[in-house]
UniProtKB/Swiss-Prot annotation:
Antitoxin component of a type II toxin-antitoxin (TA) system. Functions as an mRNA interferase antitoxin; overexpression prevents HicA-mediated cessation of cell growth and inhibition of cell proliferation. Residues 82-136 form the HTH cro/C1-type domain. SUPFAM superfamilies: lambda repressor-like DNA-binding domains (SSF47413), TTHA1013/TTHA0281-like (SSF143100). GO terms for cellular component: toxin-antitoxin complex. It comes from Escherichia coli (strain K12). This is Antitoxin HicB.
Amino acid sequence: MRYPVTLTPAPEGGYMVSFVDIPEALTQGETVAEAMEAAKDALLTAFDFYFEDNELIPLPSPLNSHDHFIEVPLSVASKVLLLNAFLQSEITQQELARRIGKPKQEITRLFNLHHATKIDAVQLAAKALGKELSLVMV
């Protein structure tokens, strides 16, 4: 999951960073490297707000070959996809817990970006939502 980044030279120096798909994620840096590091932090922070507010997270636009991008860690990408599938299903966390035979507390952890969730747990929840989580190496 790669989100395209727009780097714009700032009038005072350095670079301003924005995301077409996640407009809340704005930051800046003195160098391109600093701006890109700050962009990753801003993107993950924006994701936290989507999770807290139970809102669908926009998926990334297609990349052009010259685009700068932030690659989302797989642990986060899987939870983003799971959150979107869960919200589209319109069921409760309690119902998801019932479907996979786990306590609701474990479901709450699935939707916490700061909890190190086993990928098998995300896969099980996705399956309970009628989705398939797959991993591809290219």
